[in-house]
Amino acid sequence: MASFIWVQLKKTSEVDLAKPLVKFIQQTYPSGGEEQAQYCRAAEELSKLRRSALGRPLDKHEGALETLLRYYDQICSIEPKFPFSENQICLTFTWKDAFDKGSLFGGSVKLALASLGYEKSCVLFNCAALASQIAAEQNLDNDEGLKTAAKQYQFASGAFLHIKDTVLSALSREPTVDISPDTVGTLSLIMLAQAQEVFFLKATRDKMKDAIIAKLANQAADYFGDAFKQCQYKDALPKYFYFQEVFPTLAAKQCIMQANAEYHQSILAKQQKKFGEEIARLQHAAELIKNVASRYDEYVNVKDFSDKINRALAAAKKDNDFIYHDRVPDLKDLDPIGKATLVKPTPVNVPISQKFTDLFEKMVPVSVQQSLAVFSQRKADLVNRSIAQMREATTLANGVLASLNLPAAIEDVSGDTVPQSILTKSTAVVEQGGIQTVDQLIKELPELLQRNREILEESLRLLDEEEATDNDLRAKFKDRWQRTPSNDLYKPLRAEGAKFRAVLDKAVQADGQVKERYQSHRDTIALLCKPEPELNAAIPSANPAKTMQGSEVVNVLKSLLSNLDEIKKEREGLENDLKSVNFDMTSKFLTALAQDGVINEEALSVTELDRIYGGLTTKVQESLKKQEGLLKNIQVSHQEFSKMKQSNSEASLREEVLKNLATAYDNFVELVANLKEGTKFYNELTEILVRFQNKCSDIVFARKTERDELLKDLQQSIAREPSAPSIPPPAYQSSPAGGHATAPTPAPRTMPPAKPQPPARPPPPVLPANRVPPAAAATAPAGVGTASAAPPQTPGSAPPPQAQGPPYPTYPGYPGYCQMPMPMGYNPYTYGQYNMPYPPVYHQSPGQAPYPGPQQPTYPFPQPPQQSYYPQQ
């Protein structure tokens, strides 16, 4: 029986999985937390698992296969949890073609891609290949070996079939030949056929009914036939099928399985007293086995089976001739043998390994992470919008009060002292550092801005340089430069960079507005920073208005202002409540993903935000409406208060100064808040830009690594290309052997007199007719013709050793010299004394018999003499 077919493993380059995964984990999860530390340890374990599965030779044992399967399950598990792509987590996986042996000038074909799908396909290929090797190593003389072999062949068939269905969608370009759909589809058929063969062997060993065995064998022959047909697509499949015994082995096994089917069906025919059918089937089986023995004897040994069939055939013929005299039907008249399949490709359902434990079990998928990020943004927008509304309302209220000089107007009834509200504001400004604080904050802004600009420009410069290099190489190698253009790959990063640049431009405008407002109120703010005596001296005095003290309108204004202060305090509490709300949407998103397969983030987020923030946003709106009513009442009461006040220029001037001081305080508070917020913004933006720079640096480094690998592969492929096209043979050598057309005789050429003639050399010895070399009887190789002018061959005479050449000198350096193409079997090392760079051509005088070549048993066809023969002058 023929040996079983197994598949070689693919080889890969080492990849550090831990570093990029740890970097992503550190950027995504809070630093210092147990969750981050746990995931970082898991990333290290994953990198070790890859080295264990792919970084060392594997034994042909199920334990080694278990390691491969665990790694495959793990990368399938992490695929939805990490954003593996060229512009996010960029991991370049390099794999060599399993069937390509390379060349003298370069290694085997390999492909490097930044695709986890590519890694999955290659790892699954190795799982299937190792399963085929394990099955081929089994002892098929016991049930355990048969069971293991059948199981592993069916798994290998299913794995190859899975690659066939998924490889094109997993890769962004054409795969190497070994994992192309045609190749893995054929391998799947081969593995399935061998699994069926194992069941046939099991049925034979258990001595099951011949009808069942015949059907199993016939189905196996069918599978082997399908695989044999697939292998005939030479351009689509690797050389593996033609140079490592697969192609002839498949052909032999198809015939052997068909012969087994006929043999066991003949036994069934004998049992049914159909002796003619028995003989016909045995004859067909004998023909099939004879064909195998004659064509594929090098690969299979069918002597025992052949003897078994021949004995059965001889006995059947003898019995039929002497006893039954049953007519032997033609093969085409026989009923077809049925088929019974007991095998099918094992589907690939993750996890495949029975011992798989997910290292990142608690990590949520990327889709959930993305939904959480969008939800966090929605939450931040809602909170910021509510807080902004309250702050704007407070600013509006302060502005209205400042324009009305309240509460200073109702406190300043004496007209010659600083109102208490102004003193309070002055004290607050001094405690916060006064104008020195504002000056220092404004001074720091340009430095922070410049730092962020430099980080952003450096990040974009890295992309520009790599893209320019990629464009240069693409222009140089044209279609050979097969990788994603940097211009397309960097579009998301450039869009992100443009967004950061726009943010910085807006920040510059905001900084300008803050500085402009500060300059317009700087003097008044400086006045608030002065001690009380200086402040009192700077405020004009007015006539006393003691009669207004305790009036009804003043009491109404005080009550309204007190209510407004209460609203402001409530807003501070609401703002803290809005900021302090904290809840996790992970469980809801995971539940939705498990139930529906997708996450409707918008619907879930809006519903949950309304539930949690609905009460707080209602209070915010009530606060805004209450303030609106209070401001209207304050303005009405202030009009009455203004009518009651004594009207003079000094009072008006004093009121104007007090208004400016109140406005200056409000602007100071707002300026300090804006400047601190701007400083915080720039510092946070620096962290974001540093991450952006790291992202750009990582992808540029990965692209450079990919570029170096691609350049190396291109250099090797260029080195493997022929340096010059092959020279076609002369016309007189391309004529068919044995043809009757007379080769045209070229015109005689005159040799220049200045050239010395070569010295005469003796002719080679002539061998007697009874010493014809054995190689002389070999058939001349294709493409070497025989001139029609040669004398006809007689039995026992030596054939001409070479086609007759032109009757002019062919020695290098002489006119008319033309180097002849080497024969396909030429090997200069078979010559003992001369290593000639071209095959010599014999010349003879008209009528002279050709010279036979010396005997060289190791040469597959007649050899010319080792010295050129020159015509005697």
UniProtKB/Swiss-Prot annotation:
What disulfide bonds does the UniProt entry report for this chain?
Answer: none
Instruction: Extract the SMART domains matched here.
Output: BRO1 (SM01041)
**CDD domains noted in UniProt:** BRO1_Alix, V_Alix
Question: Localized where?
Answer: Cytoplasm, Cytosol; Melanosome; Cytoplasm, Cytoskeleton, Microtubule organizing center, Centrosome; Secreted, Extracellular exosome
Q: Where are the transmembrane segments?
A: none
Instruction: Please list the residues that carry the modification N6-acetyllysine.
Output: 215
Under Pfam families, the record lists: ALIX_LYPXL_bnd, BRO1
Query: Which key words tag this protein in UniProt?
Result: Acetylation, Apoptosis, Cell cycle, Cell division, Cell junction, Cytoplasm, Cytoskeleton, Methylation, Phosphoprotein, Protein transport, Secreted, Tight junction, Transport
> Where does the record place the modification Phosphoserine?
486, 735
**Tissue and organ expression note:** Expressed in astrocytes and glioma cells.
> Which parts of the sequence are annotated with region: Interaction with CHMP4A, CHMP4B and CHMP4C?
176-508
Query: Which region ranges are annotated with the description Self-association?
Result: 508-873
Subunit description: Self-associates. Interacts with SH3KBP1. Interacts with PDCD6 in a calcium-dependent manner. Interacts with TSG101 in a calcium-dependent manner; PDCD6IP homooligomerization may be required for TSG101-binding. Interacts with SGSM3. Directly interacts with CHMP4A, CHMP4B and CHMP4C. Directly interacts with CEP55 in a 1:2 stoechiometry; this interaction is required for PDCD6IP targeting to the midbody. May interact with PDGFRB. Interacts with SH3GL1 and SH3GL2/endophilin-1. Forms a complex with SDCBP and SDC2. Found in a complex with F-actin, TJP1/ZO-1 and PARD3. Interacts with CD2AP.
The protein, known as: Programmed cell death 6-interacting protein
Q: Which gene encodes it?
A: Pdcd6ip
